[in-house]
Amino acid sequence: MSVRDEDFAYFLKKFGEATYTDKVPESSIQKFKGILPDQLLEYWRLEGWSAYANGLMWTVNPEDYSDLVQQWLEGTHYPKIDKYHCIARTAFGVLYVWGEKYNQWFTISCPTNVIVAFDKKLFNVNPDPDHSIKSFFASASAKARDLKDL
């Protein structure tokens, strides 16, 4: 049995334990092996696809968001760079997408109708995608993912 690493433990310190969890089938883990970072697949195996902070942040099944990601990227240059998969989302429709070729990620902000990406970075192969996944979770901020009353 694997244990949580310090990066995911730090994420949980900020967001709390999952408030909802779907166990990830081994077939899904196998389907994304070699496509998404091994560390993310290990988080799926340990934690499932889950909601944190009462649904403020979710780890998700990329297949559930593939059509939405495709619609958002249609007509942009991003599909020419890589094939992207949604790995997480917020309660308010911000999607975090991961590229399978270069192992770089960016944000699709549905509520503000923008894609936030460092284009030059997207063309560079990430030498340590597992470290990037750990950093993604460790650096996550519940405050930054919440929307204030307007």
Which ranges hold each PLM region?
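Compact, glycine/acidic-enriched structural inserts
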Residues: F106-D146
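A surface-exposed partner-binding patch
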Residues: M1-F106, T112
